[in-house]
């Protein structure tokens, strides 16, 4: 087992101390107030149905004031689909912003008023041509860039999928079922870089280890 998964398993505690009432590590809001940044206002720069870009006027605790760009994005759902052979469903795609070809888990935006788990399943089918065999299970919701953006990402997990057709031609033309241990090595080699995909693969790998 790779070092990444060993580290993940070692820290994978469902009842984390930070979430236990009265436990060490929990600090009250009143104690944190002196370090809280002040927000004086936020003005819109541009927006579309998926992303809102604005400039916020903020102040540091010691008094310095400045402006910072803020990105607010619609919620996304990403799914780790695994099979009974210990493989995960990945798609090969080009990301023009970083100008790289990378392997990713299927995922995308959750439409307004859409059930997030249903959106996760829809994205899997649209992007890969595989339909999840069950309703995807929500693993966690995380924020990948809280220093300058609000971009909630839901990570889902499901075992089994049925092949129902070809993926959307605008998404990818290369789909692969990759052994989880190989996927972990791809992360270590930098072939998988997306936050949701990295977390999803390591989570699936930890579940695989937990069952063994």
Q: What is the meaning of each model-derived region?
A:
Residues 40-78, 84:
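Acidic, metal-coordinating catalytic segment for phosphate/diphosphate chemistry
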Residues 2-11:
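Single-pass alpha-helical transmembrane signal-anchor segments in small membrane proteins across taxa
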Residues 73-104:
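A glycine-rich, hydrophobic loop/mini-helix early in the fold
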Residues 44-49, 96, 141-153, 209:
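Acidic pyrophosphate-coordinating catalytic loop
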Residues 66, 73-78, 83, 108-196:
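Unchanged
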Residues 10-37, 64, 101, 112, ...:
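Nudix hydrolase/Nudix homology domain
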Residues 36-45, 135-137:
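Short secondary-structure junctions
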């Amino acid at each position: 087992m790779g070092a990444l998964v060993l580290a993940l398993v070692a820290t994978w505690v469902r009842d984390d101390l930070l979430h236990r009432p009265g436990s060490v590590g929990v600090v009250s809001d009143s104690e944190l107030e002196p370090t809280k940044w002040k927000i004086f206002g936020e003005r819109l720069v541009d927006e579309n149905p998926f992303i809102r870009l604005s400039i916020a006027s903020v102040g540091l605790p010691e008094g310095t004031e400045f402006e910072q760009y803020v990105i607010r994005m619609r919620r996304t759902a990403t799914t780790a689909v695994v099979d009974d052979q210990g493989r995960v469903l990945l798609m090969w795609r080009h990301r023009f912003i970083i100008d790289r070809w990378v392997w990713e888990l299927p995922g995308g935006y959750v439409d307004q008023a859409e059930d997030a788990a249903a959106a996760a399943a829809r994205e899997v089918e649209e992007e890969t041509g595989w339909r999840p065999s069950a309703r995807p299970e929500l693993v966690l919701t995380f924020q990948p860039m809280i220093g300058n953006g609000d971009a909630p990402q839901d990570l889902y997990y499901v075992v089994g999928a049925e092949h129902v057709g070809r993926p959307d031609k605008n998404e990818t033309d290369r789909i692969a079922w990759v052994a989880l241990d190989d996927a972990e090595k791809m992360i270590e080699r930098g072939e998988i870089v997306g936050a949701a995909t990295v977390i999803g693969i390591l989570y699936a790998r930890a579940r695989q280890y937990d069952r063994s």
